[in-house]
UniProtKB/Swiss-Prot annotation:
This is Small ribosomal subunit protein uS3. Belongs to the universal ribosomal protein uS3 family. One of its GO terms (cellular component) is cytosolic small ribosomal subunit. The keyword RNA-binding applies. Keywords: Ribonucleoprotein, Ribosomal protein, RNA-binding, rRNA-binding. Binds the lower part of the 30S subunit head. Binds mRNA in the 70S ribosome, positioning it for translation. GO terms for biological process: translation. Residues 234-243 have a biased composition (Basic and acidic residues). One of its GO terms (molecular function) is structural constituent of ribosome. It comes from Synechococcus sp. (strain WH7803).
Length: 243
């Protein structure tokens, strides 16, 4: 069953959290759900170059809180926070309420090559540049291993290398225990648009097991997480709507 069900949905409330955190009546629930979907599509379309890994949305009364996990926070923040103001205006326009209070938090992803969505995005970019899929997968696996992941599985489907007949190829390195509920599995999908058609990409990343409140992450011997020298993870919290 663990191989059929969505890895994130299976672990909600155990090792994964909901992407939308709010409660609503049955009457307003569909409207708010569609609103969340529009916000996410707007952010990924407009800021695709910022390496956005995840978008978390929370609601408190009439306030909307959006948390962005990104590999390049500087692209979102901009000079003196101008990017935040532009993003807020875009979200207000997307929801159709220019007076909506929007609070934005930008969080930098610590280990870029250990993030499933960013890995899938990297693979899609390489495939769209017509790089051979086997070479692309091998490079992605090497990047993830250097980042210190415990296991990785990558699957690519479609007309690989322009073949006449579509097929599915996959590879796995290390452990990816899909049946273990306490396993911290990061899962993402991505679509690559090529001249031969679209290719579907799926990435599973095993980061360790969560026992109690702490994640037991055992880095492989010699593994060194890929981080830019001299920089620490940053979190930019937007407080312009307070007071």
């Amino acid at each position: 069953m663990g191989h059929k069900i969505h890895p994130t949905g299976l672990r909600l409330g155990i090792t994964q959290e909901h992407r939308s955190r709010w409660y609503a009546s049955s009457k307003s629930y569909p409207t708010l759900l569609k609103e969340d979907d529009r916000i996410r599509k707007f952010i990924h379309k407009k800021y695709g170059s910022a390496g956005i890994s995840d978008v978390l949305i929370a609601r408190k009364a009439d306030q909307l809180e959006v948390e962005l996990k990104t590999a390049r926070p500087g692209v979102l923040v901009g000079r003196q926070g101008s990017g935040i103001e532009e993003l807020r205006s875009g979200i207000q326009k997307t929801v159709g309420d220019p007076n909506r209070q929007v609070r934005i938090n930008v969080v930098e992803v610590e280990r870029v090559d250990a993030d499933a969505f960013l890995l899938a995005e990297y693979i899609a970019q390489q495939l769209e540049k017509r790089v051979a899929f086997r070479r692309t997968i091998r490079m992605a696996v090497q990047r993830a291993q250097r980042a210190g992941v415990l296991g990785l599985k990558i699957q690519v489907s479609g007309r690989l290398n322009g073949a006449e007949i579509a097929r599915t190829e996959w590879t796995r390195e290390g452990r990816v225990p899909l049946h273990t509920l306490r396993a911290d599995i990061d899962y993402a999908t991505k679509v690559a648009s090529t001249t031969y058609g679209v290719l579907g990409i799926k990435v599973w990343v095993f980061k360790g097991e969560v026992l109690g409140d702490e994640a037991q992450q055992q880095l492989p011997v010699g593994a060194t997480p890929r981080r830019r020298a001299g920089r620490r993870p940053q979190q930019f919290e937007d407080r312009s709507n307070e007071g």
